[in-house]
Amino acid sequence: MDAKQVRERLIAMGINFFSADLFIAYHRERPKIWEEFAAAALALCEDGERRISAKHICEKIRYERQMEKRGEFKISNSMVSLYARVFVLKYPEYADRIVLKEAVGPKVEAA
């Protein structure tokens, strides 16, 4: 899924245009965040976790990095829910396990 598709799908999920564009720019500058987020989320799903919050995923990464002395995991709190939405788009088989809060923007049909 390319950046344009991600943007369109986020907007269809109720994320406003500004936040979707901000997320795409943020991701382009920090692609490693997605790699770690997706890997941690997949591990939790495959371990049988039934309800997983995006905040929990980020805190798990932060904790593991601290224990392994790999440096801090820095992610803007305003981006956490967007990473969760992208995870659900990329891995729809786990959509029922990822807790998503209601987006406050208007829902529109994706192109």
Report residues per predicted region:
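Positively charged, polyanion-binding regions of nucleic-acid-associated proteins
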Residues: D21-H56, R62-E68
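Generic structural signal of hydrophobic/aromatic residues within well-ordered alpha-helices
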Residues: V6, S19-F23, F37-A41, I57, ...
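Acidic, proline/glycine-rich low-complexity IDRs
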Residues: F87-A111
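Intrinsically disordered, low-complexity serine/threonine- and proline-rich regulatory segments
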Residues: M1-E35
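Charge-enriched amphipathic alpha-helical scaffolds
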Residues: K55-D96
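Serine/threonine-rich low-complexity intrinsically disordered regions
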Residues: D2, N16-A20, S53, S76, ...
